[in-house]
Amino acid sequence: DINGGGATLPQALYQTSGVL
């Protein structure tokens, strides 16, 4: 939930790709 996606998946993935 680094980018506020609220996902339980690897947060580093969202932080890198900027998804959600």
Curated annotation (Swiss-Prot):
What is the reported tissue distribution?
Expressed by the venom gland.
Q: Name one GO cellular component term.
A: extracellular region
Query: Coiled-coil intervals in this record?
Result: none
* Catalytic activity field: a phosphate monoester + H2O = an alcohol + phosphate
Q: What GO molecular function annotation could you give as one example from this UniProt entry? A: alkaline phosphatase activity
* EC number of the protein: 3.1.3.1
Signal peptide span: none
Instruction: Supply the alphabetized keyword list.
Output: Hemorrhagic toxin, Hemostasis impairing toxin, Hydrolase, Secreted, Toxin
The record's principal subcellular location, in a coarse class, is secreted
Q: Does the keyword Hydrolase apply?
A: yes
Q: Where in the cell is it found?
A: Secreted
The task this protein performs is described as: Has hemorrhagic activity.
Name the record gives this protein: Alkaline phosphatase
